[in-house]
Amino acid sequence: SGSCEVKTCWWSQPDFRVIGDYLKDKYDSASEMVVEKHRESRGWVETLRPKYNFFKAPTEKDLVYYENSPNFCEPNPETGSFGTRDRICNVTSHGIDGCDLLCCGRGHNTRTEKRKEKCHCIF
């Protein structure tokens, strides 16, 4: 009689919330960069450096950018964005659907509607 031992190892993804929080932290601390062109023996080379000298150079794990994101609060025909004006928001939410964030700090109007609809209920 023989015995058999099976050992299984695998990697698993962290919880989606953990990944989202990690990426949000990276986004919030992203470094703005500028592209510098300089001549080397093989021709022109482009490198990125921090836009402001008082910031340390980013590491390989830091998030960097060299163009500002568009302002999604305002309409932009080039990108097809309608902006956030007249959007429905959630007054009680502090998330992305909340009025403070969605209305870009412009304030919001509260409107109460009463509707009469057939509900097709069966009793």
UniProtKB/Swiss-Prot annotation:
Could you tell me the gene encoding this protein? WNT3A
Which positions anchor the lipid (O-palmitoleoyl serine)? 1
| Biological processes per GO annotation | canonical Wnt signaling pathway; cell fate commitment; neuron differentiation
| Entry-linked Gene3D superfamilies | 3.30.2460.20
Per the record, the similarity remark reads: Belongs to the Wnt family.
Q: What is this protein called?
A: Protein Wnt-3a
Q: Which InterPro entries did the record assign?
A: Wnt, Wnt_C
Cysteine pairings via disulfide bonds? 89-104
Taking the first listed entry, what is the main subcellular location of this protein, grouped into a coarse class?
Answer: secreted
Q: Name one GO molecular function term.
A: frizzled binding
GO cellular component entries:
extracellular space
Q: Where in the cell is it found?
A: Secreted, Extracellular space, Extracellular matrix; Secreted
State the species of origin.
Meleagris gallopavo (Wild turkey)
- Tell me the classification of the organism that encodes this protein: Eukaryota, Metazoa, Chordata, Craniata, Vertebrata
Print the keywords alphabetically. Answer: Developmental protein, Disulfide bond, Extracellular matrix, Glycoprotein, Lipoprotein, Secreted, Wnt signaling pathway
Please give one Pfam family short name.
wnt
